[in-house]
Amino acid sequence: MIKVGIIGSTGYTGLELIRLLHNHPNAKIIALCSRINASKSVIKEFPSLISYIDLDFVTPNEKKLFECDIIFFATPHGVAMNSVSKFLNKDIKIIDLGADFRIKDSTEWSKWYGMTHTQGDLLKDAVYGLPEVYNSQIKNATLIANPGCYPTAIILALKPLLETNIIDTKSIIADCKSGVSGAGRSANIATLFCEVNESLKPYNVDQHRHKPETQQVLTDIAGKEVNFFFTPHLVPMTRGMLASIYVDLIKDINVQKLFEKHYQNNKFIHILPTNVYPQTKSVKGTNNCHIGIQKSNNKLIIMSVIDNIIKGASGQAIQNMNLMFGLDEGLGLEQIGLLP
């Protein structure tokens, strides 16, 4: 049984880790950390966990953490980088759901996140945890940088095209929409009900922090520099993400067949039939990514949807854990979507 600890267990991604890991046949949560709620009963703070979790929250310095086989950091950027070394030195595996190890260049990271990276030497060892791209590296990793939600949706939609070199890599447009849970659980005026209800707005246009990690991986896949324009939007729903990506084809091939063949053996990526378009409701509560394709002359639109908290965060983290421990990557993650 894999002994699991979660640091930052009261945010949306931390709570989703608890929910998913409870049903994992090979994992057992032994430590849930929260500075604010230390010593408080988990079920008193989160009644949805009554009869499922019989633990009290502990501080991140709790000795129990050193009994873990793996620790998930479901924390804001800047937290994991100052804490992981003491666990790695004890041969405890780490998955960081934050952004601390996603960008390989510490100077570039500091530019986007506004602070100095204190563990630049670990960046070279961290593996970007997108199993559909770095599967073999994840299996041998001890430190995983779990991808952001936007990068996950964008990269999965573009991977087959970049690997076959059939699109212009300088004119890609990513038009993305996210549910409000992507902003986290902390109080914020911008995500209050009255601010987001019946409203749709772009934000951080081409300046979102997820852009550099996306560009880094797309360039790695293509083997040459990839540039893209990125407009994220906030939509008035709790969870879900849609990425509509516009590209110019430089070769005329059957793109539908290309995608179907590319992902035919993949557990979580599903290519929809021609003229069937993805919707966020179809993947809600799952680790799936649905992809639809529409071609018009030399233009191609790829549409991908994910649950931003599961495939975009906690589910993907568990998928990575499975690979790190030599398990089937889908273990504990094959839920059917919620409908309605």
Swiss-Prot record:
It is found in: Cytoplasm. The active site is at 149. Pfam families: Semialdhyde_dh, Semialdhyde_dhC_1. Pathway: Amino-acid biosynthesis; L-arginine biosynthesis; N(2)-acetyl-L-ornithine from L-glutamate: step 3/4. The keyword NADP applies. It is an enzyme of class 1 (oxidoreductase). Its EC number is 1.2.1.38. SMART domains: Semialdhyde_dh. GO terms for cellular component: cytoplasm. GO terms for biological process: L-arginine biosynthetic process. The keyword Disulfide bond does not apply. GO terms for molecular function: N-acetyl-gamma-glutamyl-phosphate reductase activity; NAD binding; NADP+ binding. It catalyses: N-acetyl-L-glutamate 5-semialdehyde + phosphate + NADP(+) = N-acetyl-L-glutamyl 5-phosphate + NADPH + H(+). InterPro entries: AGPR_AS, AGPR_type-1, NAD(P)-bd_dom_sf, NAGSA_dehydrogenase, Semialdehyde_DH_NAD-bd. Keywords: Amino-acid biosynthesis, Arginine biosynthesis, Cytoplasm, NADP, Oxidoreductase. SUPFAM superfamilies: Glyceraldehyde-3-phosphate dehydrogenase-like, C-terminal domain, NAD(P)-binding Rossmann-fold domains. HAMAP family: ArgC_type1. Catalyzes the NADPH-dependent reduction of N-acetyl-5-glutamyl phosphate to yield N-acetyl-L-glutamate 5-semialdehyde. Belongs to the NAGSA dehydrogenase family. Type 1 subfamily. This is N-acetyl-gamma-glutamyl-phosphate reductase. The gene is argC.
